[in-house]
Regions:
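Symmetry-related core transmembrane helices of the 12-TM Major Facilitator Superfamily/SLC fold
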Residues: 159-175, 361-376
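Helix-to-loop junctions at the C-terminal end of transmembrane segments
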Residues: 56-68, 255-266, 352
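Helix-loop boundary and gating motifs at the non-cytosolic
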Residues: 3-50, 216-229, 233
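Cytoplasmic helix-loop-helix junction between adjacent transmembrane helices
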Residues: 101-137, 316
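Juxtamembrane intracellular "pre-TM" segments in multi-pass secondary transporters
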Residues: 1-3, 181-208
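Structural signature of the two symmetry-related core transmembrane helices
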Residues: 71-85, 269-283
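Central cavity-lining transmembrane alpha-helices of secondary-active solute carriers
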Residues: 47-60, 245-257
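Paired small-residue
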Residues: 94-102, 293-301
Length: 390
C-alpha cells in the first residue's frame, strides 16, 4: 500500500474521530441541560474525555516504539467504538462519565499514532501543509458532529448509534494498512526514560505547546458551555446545532492557507497574529451577543483565525525538535490540549453560573487576551531556541 494512500486513510480516520468528539460534547451537554443538570456540573462532566487523554499519555511512547504506530491506532479506534456503543445501553451520569473517559483514552491513542505517522513520514518542507490537511479533516468531522448531535431529538441513542457505525467503517479501512515505526535514537531510547525525553521536549519546544493548550480551552468551552448559554437565552436546539459548527467550519476554510503561510513566514509569527485578531472578534461577539447572526459570523471568523492553532502548534513542535523526540512531542501536545480542554468547560460553566448578567463571550475575550500577552515575545524566544540547537 502506497504512502500516499495510507496518508489519506489516516486523515479519513481522524475525520471520523473528529465527528464523534464533535457530537459527544454538545449532545451530552444538551441532554443534561434538559434533565436540569447545573452548568458547572455539566462542564465538569465534559472533562472526563480529557482526563482520559491525560491518564493514557505517559504510557504511549514506549509501546509505539516497540510495536509501531498501527497497533496504537487500531486499539484506540476499537476502544472508541465499544465506548460509543455502550452509550446506547444506559443513561447514567457516572456510567457516561466513565464512557467519556474511555473515549478520551481511545481517541488520544488514535491521534498520537496518526500525528506521529504524519510528522515523521512527511517531507520537512511540507510539514505545515500535511499537518494542515490533518487539521482540515479533523475539523470537517468536528463541524459535522453538532449536526449529528441534533438527532438526539429523535431519541437519546440516535447520535451514538450513527457515530458507532461510522467509526466502525473507518476502523475496518485501517486494518489493511502497513505498520510503521517512529524515528529513534537508539542510544537515547535505551539510556533515558520517557520522562527524561518529555523534559527535553519541554526545554526545546515549550512555546509550541501554547497552540494545543489554547485550542483545547476554546474548543471545549465553545462546544460544552455555548449550548447551555444559548439554550438559556431562548435559542432552540436547531439554532444551537447550526451555530456550533461555525467555529470548526472557519478552521476548515483557512487551515491549509495558514499552514502554507506558516511554511513560508514561520509558525511563530502566524500564531502570534491569530491570538491578536481573535481577541477582537470575541469582544465583538460579546457586545452583540443578542443578535444570532452576528454571533454566528463571529464564531465563523474566530474559527478562521484561531481554529488552526492546534495544527500550527504541532507543526511548530516539528520545527523545534529532532525527529527522535517527535513521539514525545506529539504526546505532550495532546497533554497540553487535554489540560486546556479540562480547563475550558469548568471555567466556562463557572462563568455562566456566577456571572449571570454579562455575555459568555467575555470569557473567550479574556482568555484570548491573556494568551496573546503570554506569547508576546514568542518570535524572539523561538529564534533563541533555534540558535541553541545549532
Amino acid at each position: 500500500m502506497s504512502m500516499r494512500f495510507t496518508f489519506w486513510i489516516m486523515v479519513g480516520i481522524v475525520a471520523i474521530s473528529g465527528l464523534s468528539q464533535g457530537m459527544l460534547l454538545p449532545a451530552i451537554a444538551m441532554i443534561f441541560e434538559q434533565e436540569g443538570v447545573s452548568s458547572s456540573i455539566n462542564g465538569i462532566h465534559a472533562t472526563a474525555l480529557y482526563i482520559g487523554i491525560l491518564v493514557i499519555s505517559p504510557f504511549l511512547e514506549k509501546p509505539m516504539q516497540k510495536f509501531g504506530m498501527k497497533p496504537i491506532i487500531v486499539i484506540g479506534g476499537f476502544l472508541v467504538i465499544i465506548s460509543l456503543f455502550f452509550f446506547t445501553q444506559t443513561f447514567s451520569f457516572w456510567v457516561w462519565f466513565i464512557l467519556r473517559f474511555l473515549v478520551g483514552v481511545g481517541d488520544h491513542m488514535l491521534h498520537v499514532g496518526t500525528q506521529t505517522w504524519i510528522t515523521t513520514t512527511s517531507d520537512p518542507s511540507k510539514i505545515g501543509r500535511q499537518v494542515s490537511i490533518y487539521g482540515v479533516f479533523f475539523g470537517i468531522g468536528f463541524a459535522v458532529g453538532p449536526y449529528l448531535a441534533s438527532t438526539v431529538q429523535y431519541g437519546l441513542a440516535t447520535p451514538f448509534i450513527i457515530s458507532t457505525i461510522l467509526c466502525l467503517i473507518g476502523w475496518l479501512l485501517l486494518l489493511p494498512t502497513k505498520n510503521a515505526f517512529p524515528a529513534q535514537d537508539e542510544r537515547e531510547v535505551k539510556s533515558k526514560s520517557s520522562f527524561s525525553r518529555y523534559k527535553q521536549v519541554v526545554g526545546l519546544g515549550w512555546i509550541a505547546l501554547l497552540g494545543p493548550l489554547a485550542y483545547g480551552v476554546l474548543e471545549a468551552m465553545l462546544n460544552s458551555n455555548l449550548p447551555v448559554y444559548a439554550l438559556r437565552k431562548g435559542w432552540s436546539v436547531s439554532d444551537v446545532s447550526f451555530l456550533l459548527p461555525a467555529f470548526a467550519v472557519g478552521g476548515i476554510i483557512t487551515q491549509i492557507p495558514l499552514g502554507i503561510l506558516s511554511d513560508k513566514y514561520g509558525r511563530d509569527r502566524i500564531l502570534t497574529w491569530t491570538f491578536s485578531v481573535s481577541t477582537g472578534i470575541f469582544l465583538l461577539a460579546a457586545v452583540f451577543d443578542q443578535y444570532y447572526w452576528i454571533v454566528f459570523a463571529c464564531m465563523l471568523l474566530v474559527g478562521m483565525v484561531i481554529g488552526s492553532c492546534f495544527s500550527l502548534g504541532l507543526g511548530f513542535m516539528t520545527d523545534l525538535l529532532p525527529r527522535h523526540l517527535l513521539p514525545a512531542g506529539n504526546i505532550l501536545s495532546g497533554i497540553a490540549f487535554s489540560l486546556g480542554s479540562i480547563m475550558g468547560p469548568v471555567l466556562g460553566g463557572v462563568f455562566i453560573e456566577k456571572i449571570q448578567y454579562t455575555s459568555f463571550f467575555y470569557c473567550g475575550y479574556d482568555y484570548n487576551g491573556n494568551s496573546r500577552n503570554g506569547i508576546y515575545g514568542l518570535h524572539e524566544e523561538s529564534i533563541r531556541i533555534k540558535k541553541n540547537r545549532k
